[in-house]
Amino acid sequence: MCQVEEDYNGLECNQEKIPVSGLNRKCMKCKEGTAVLIIRVSDAFCRSCFKEYFIHKFRAMLGKNRVIFPQEKVLLAVSGGAASCTMLSQVQEGLSRDAPKKLRFMPGIVYIDDGGACGRSEDERQTSISQLKNIFTQTGFPYFIVPLEKVFSLPTSVLVPGTSDPDPSNPCYKQAVDKYLKEKQKLREEEAVCAVAQLNLEDSAYLPEHKLALQRLFSSLKTLSAKQEMLQTLRQHLILHVARENSYSKVMMGESCSRLAVKLLSNIALGRGAALASDTGFSDPRFGDVVIVRPMRDYSSKEITFYNRMFHVPSVFIPGLDTKSHDKASIQRLTESFVTNLQADFPSTVSTIYRTSEKLHTVRPPQSQSTEPEPASKCLLCLCALDTTADKASAFHATLISEQLSQLRLQEGSVDLVAGSSDQCCVEDQTCGTSGCCSSKRTPVQQDLKTLLCYSCRLTVKDMAAVNTLPPYILTEAEKRQRRSQMKVEISEYLLEEDQD
């Protein structure tokens, strides 16, 4: 039987790995050329066949799903890493004149500069931005470079799901293709040049107070796991805002198969099991009017590295929050280390996890199948469906009861403080709430936000020392939803139920 802290070093030494000879192997596809790389044990490719295989996989992923329509504006989220830069290269290759199956959408690029959250200096951030600008300019696509500090000037409309009504002019994919082939886009190149010139003037500056506010926000988060989750959420909000402001209906993410395998396991550990289908699937329609697609999800990190190395795809290394951190620094980092080490000895680990994620689907509640869900039915931060309406016999309900009992004294003290200050107002000779000052600027506390969050986002907010460090658009939308819920409770006796005439 297995024992805790048992030494397996002796067994590891006795296990001999079977050497795989790669000398003078022929390409598995053309059977003529000499193989220059081996993706898996039996998959040896020559240079030309590997390029054809790599490009075909990207086109097949888009063609199989048929989510992106001709003449549709698609925003490419590029982080500077190997996977996202490869995605940019594939789009550029697919839009070229020599492409056999030419892509027909209109791309744009967005880069979120999160150096302020990662503790990078201004010079380091500008160096990375200049390197990325050189890559973006060579593509000829319009691009946006947005600092993470911009989240403190976002509107509350970012947290409101848009309508996902289909375009009546493009009722199906076939008709959209026929319309594209009939129309000639004579001014497309001129428009692209003008767009690049305009977007070069995109204001990438930020206010000093926003930089300090961002530092306070991430300083209030106690764990690295919570910091990474918050960074991912804020980055997603910025990308969504850029897409809506510039009429992009699709957003491409460069997440590879290896990255999604790690994300699947780490999200389960973080309590995001109900949102796995949206977080790891090919398309993510949670935002309604903007759909996130992941065309790189069939590529492993090994394939991407080989392709970038052989065909000189430029990329920029930008340190993140978990750079140079140890394996147990966060749940995400620990999961990545676990999957990577397991993949080294068992090459089918990543593919097995990835194939499992393909079978996941989100079941919509019966009341939301015919109509669009209300904003109150979605999480305030990640905009996924709330998974906190569980039965009393569930593990989630038992966790809530345990938490309430452990914090009973603390909650009673906070209630007394709120009750003692409820009649005071910042305006003289007026009661609280009549002038609108206290009611409109009241900062939500942790307990108020929990009712608006999914289980995973509750854990993230729970790790915060001060909730008032969140960006203003989140606090404003939270207060708005709380008011609507309170108003609904007050007039509930006058409302007709759905089963009543």
From Swiss-Prot:
It comes from the Eukaryota. Pathway: tRNA modification; 5-methoxycarbonylmethyl-2-thiouridine-tRNA biosynthesis. Signal peptide: none annotated. Keywords: Cytoplasm, tRNA processing. GO terms for biological process: protein urmylation; tRNA thio-modification; tRNA wobble position uridine thiolation; tRNA wobble uridine modification. InterPro entries: CTU2, Rossmann-like_a/b/a_fold. GO terms for cellular component: cytosol. It is found in: Cytoplasm. It holds the Pfam family CTU2. One of its GO terms (molecular function) is sulfurtransferase activity. Belongs to the CTU2/NCS2 family. Plays a central role in 2-thiolation of mcm(5)S(2)U at tRNA wobble positions of tRNA(Lys), tRNA(Glu) and tRNA(Gln). May act by forming a heterodimer with ctu1/atpbd3 that ligates sulfur from thiocarboxylated urm1 onto the uridine of tRNAs at wobble position. This is Cytoplasmic tRNA 2-thiolation protein 2.
